[in-house]
Curated annotation (Swiss-Prot):
Taxonomy of the source species: Bacteria, Pseudomonadati, Pseudomonadota, Gammaproteobacteria, Enterobacterales
Positions with a binding annotation for Zn(2+) 1: H66, D99, E162
Keyword Amino-acid biosynthesis carried by entry: yes
Protein's UniProt name: Succinyl-diaminopimelate desuccinylase
One Pfam family this sequence matches: M20_dimer
Cofactor(s) in the UniProt record: Zn(2+); Co(2+)
Enzyme active site: D68, E133
Length: 375
């Protein structure tokens, strides 16, 4: 017996949509949505394809996701070509199966079933889809959100289909995400010969006490929703490659994943104060990729928990761990934002796969969420 969710997922996987190339995925989704009465607005920016689609009016529940995928890596290491979907032992293999073409298929099929049963639904059902989530994310969801906010679009609830689950579908639901702040720091010294250190100023030596103190800071202890803020050095570079040259500069890049106990300005102020304390000459550049956000218990969280409990008979954990997602942009609209998607064990890996039965289950969960909020 054929399954519309699996069939649509396979059609999407066959389109090699390496970010930000959509490769025809959105045209396929748009065709399905227009067939059930959705109005579709394409909102392309530069090399990125996006669309905003809606049906009905009133309180708005949007489903958000991305059609782009990361590169497959060495295709010869896959058990089948990465863009040729294959089912083995109940698992659907292919790049994007879990992140997140399976979720997109489940959303669309859920909408088709929902509209068939509730053609005159009382709320507004919407979709916000982009082809640039995995790469820079500069021209994707963030630009669509800015355009929607500029015209005062209303968005009450948003379900993001990112692969949130760990062992079984629905065991983890993300009701928030930590903020992400990156510091690109250059410590300036004076280049010279290692045999004449008095004629140079070694930025590595100067920066070492600063780095040690930075690493030792306990930024906060987190709270009931967020783990403690973490700081990790990601890159550090100095020197010419020669063993007889004192470097003139040290570059160090570090990233903060921060909770709602802090703001990005508080972090910046503490880092800058530490630099001044150690009397360093420096140039600094900050990149804030997202503020922390949290959706506390409310109508959306309750609807998602209800759907998981109904179909999988488990109570999901509400967590804010992991990386950033496009939910950070959507939360700016004042919407309640929750992430629910398939198991994430193989995302971005060789032989990415998802349990085919999980996608069928996910479509039912999505439909039940629609029924609770906009029927």
């Amino acid at each position: 017996m054929s399954c519309p969710v699996i069939e649509l997922t396979q059609q999407l996987i066959r389109r090699p949509s390496l970010s930000p190339d959509d490769a025809g995925c959105q045209a396929l989704l748009i065709e399905r949505l227009q067939a059930i009465g959705f109005t579709v607005e394409r909102m392309d920016f530069a090399d990125t394809q996006n669309f905003w689609a809606w049906r009905g009016q009133g309180e708005t529940l949007a489903f958000a996701g991305h059609t782009d995928v990361v590169p497959p890596g060495d295709a010869d290491r896959w058990i089948n070509p990465p863009f040729e979907p294959t089912i083995r032992d109940g698992m659907l293999f292919g790049r994007g199966a879990a992140d997140m073409k399976g979720s997109l298929a489940a959303m669309v099929v859920a909408a088709e079933r929902f509209v068939a049963q509730h053609p005159n639904h009382t709320g507004r059902l919407a979709f916000l889809i982009t082809s640039d989530e995995e790469a820079s994310a500069h021209n994707g969801t963030v630009k669509v959100v800015e355009a929607l906010m500029a015209r005062n679009e209303r968005l009450d609830y948003c379900l993001v289909g990112e692969p949130s689950s760990i062992e079984v579908v629905g065991d983890v639901v993300k009701n928030g995400r930590r903020g992400s702040l990156t510091c690109n720091l250059t410590i300036h010294g004076v280049q010279g010969h290692v045999a004449y250190p008095h004629l140079a100023d070694n930025p590595v030596h100067r920066a070492a006490p600063f780095i040690n103190e930075l690493v030792a800071i306990e930024w906060d202890q987190g709270n009931e929703f967020f783990p403690a803020t973490s700081m990790q050095i990601a890159n550090i570079q100095a020197g010419t490659g020669s063993n007889n040259v004192i470097p003139g500069e040290l570059f160090v890049q570090f990233n903060f994943r921060f909770s709602t106990e802090l703001t990005d300005e508080m972090i910046k102020a503490q880092v800058l104060a530490l630099l001044e304390k150690h009397q360093l000459r420096y140039t600094v550049d900050w990149w804030l990729s997202g503020q922390p956000f949290l959706t506390a218990r409310g109508k959306l969280v309750d609807a998602v928990v209800n759907a998981v409990e109904h179909y999988n008979e488990i109570k999901p954990q509400l967590l804010t761990t992991g990386g950033t997602s496009d939910g950070r942009f959507i939360a700016r609209m004042g919407a309640q934002v929750v992430e629910l998607g398939p198991v994430n064990a193989t995302i971005h890996k060789i032989n990415e796969c998802v349990n085919a039965a999980d996608l069928q289950l996910l479509a039912r969960m999505y439909q039940r969420i629609m029924e609770q909020l906009v029927a």
